[in-house]
């Protein structure tokens, strides 16, 4: 299955913290329907305890990680300059845009779906 979604760390971290809305949304995904960037993987793996890190690792292993490319890096730099985003957020946006994926996030401060049609806010807490 070709992926449709690029998952941001907010959704995965919410799931790991027991936020039911995140868990329910993730459970609806079919195998191969979503991917995570290496940036999301690194952010999620920053658990504070060994147990958190193990749970995070197991979760991250269930998603493919497409490579970052020069094209994505160039677009991320443009988006950072244009929008003032932090570089990890700019990379997420660039990867979603270049791959034709919906960026699934809860970060409405930076990613307003009205301004950015590549963004999907699956739930609010």
Locations of regions flagged by a protein language model:
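Short, well-structured N-terminal submotif of metal-dependent ribonuclease cores
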Residues: 1-36, 45-58, 125
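Acidic, PIN/NYN-like endoribonuclease modules and their adjacent C-terminal/linker elements
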Residues: 2, 93-125
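Generic structural signal for small/hydrophobic residues in well-ordered secondary structure
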Residues: 8-9, 44, 76, 96, ...
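Alpha-helix capping/helix-boundary segments
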Residues: 11-12, 40, 72, 91-92, ...
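Short active-site oxyanion
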Residues: 32-33, 61-64, 97-102
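Acidic catalytic patch
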Residues: 42, 61-82
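Short glycine/serine/threonine/alanine-rich loop segments
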Residues: 81, 85, 101
């Amino acid at each position: 299955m070709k992926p449709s979604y690029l998952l941001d760390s907010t959704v995965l971290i919410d799931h790991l913290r027991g936020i039911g809305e995140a868990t329910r949304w993730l459970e609806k995904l079919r195998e191969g329907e979503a991917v995570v960037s290496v940036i999301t993987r690194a952010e999620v793996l920053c658990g504070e305890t060994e147990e958190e890190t193990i749970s995070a690792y197991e979760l991250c292993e269930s998603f493919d990680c497409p490579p970052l490319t020069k094209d994505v890096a160039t677009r991320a730099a443009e988006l950072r300059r244009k929008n003032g985003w932090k570089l990890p957020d700019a990379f997420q946006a660039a990867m979603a845009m270049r791959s034709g994926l919906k960026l699934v996030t809860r970060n409405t401060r930076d990613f307003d779906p009205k301004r950015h049609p590549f963004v999907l806010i699956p739930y609010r807490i």
